[in-house]
């Protein structure tokens, strides 16, 4: 069975934006080049670039409703962000993430990255496993999603997986 995507919006512009689409999805801010791809599969989502970001390639997929993303000042970020309904991603100022990394936020969780952080490459951040695991005896779910909080001045090494 194929389910059509009703609320699809893609943006690849390279200038200042202050846009709201027909589904209430908002993009505010500026980035360096046309290598940022933003896709909405939902409504009522908001992305804020507080200041011009630099990137070689950044894909942002908002896969649901009521998503909030805020990227701070003077950030260099590359990779893939996939975020689900009712989730939040807050990136502080001066993030240096020159290589491709993955940020996957689901199950109503949030990820917060402090100021002045540096990330190497091949890093995957996940708030959840994106599938349920149940205890065979109790039948209770044992892998519920949790928030990720990274403080200020944190270095994350190459190929680190959360």
Segments the model singles out, each with a brief description of its role:
Residues 1-55, 116, 129-134, 153:
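Terminal amphipathic alpha-helical/low-complexity segments used for targeting or macromolecular assembly
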Residues 46-162:
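Flexible, glycine/small-residue-enriched loop-and-beta-strand segment within the central core
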């Amino acid at each position: 069975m194929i389910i059509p995507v009703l609320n699809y919006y893609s943006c690849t512009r390279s200038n200042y934006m202050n846009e709201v689409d027909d589904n209430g999805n908002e993009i505010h801010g500026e980035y360096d080049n046309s290598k940022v791809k933003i896709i909405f599969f939902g409504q009522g989502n908001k992305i804020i670039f507080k200041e011009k970001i630099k990137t070689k390639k950044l894909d942002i997929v908002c896969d649901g409703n009521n998503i909030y993303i805020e990227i701070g000042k003077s950030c260099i970020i590359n990779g893939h962000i996939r975020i689900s309904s009712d989730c939040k991603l807050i990136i502080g100022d001066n993030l240096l993430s020159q290589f491709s990394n993955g940020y996957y936020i689901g199950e109503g969780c949030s990820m917060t990255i402090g100021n002045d952080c540096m990330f190497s490459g091949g890093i995957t951040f996940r708030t959840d496993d994106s599938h349920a695991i149940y205890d065979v005896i109790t039948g209770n779910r044992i892998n519920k999603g949790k928030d990720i909080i990274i403080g200020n001045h944190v270095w994350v090494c190459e190929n680190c997986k959360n």
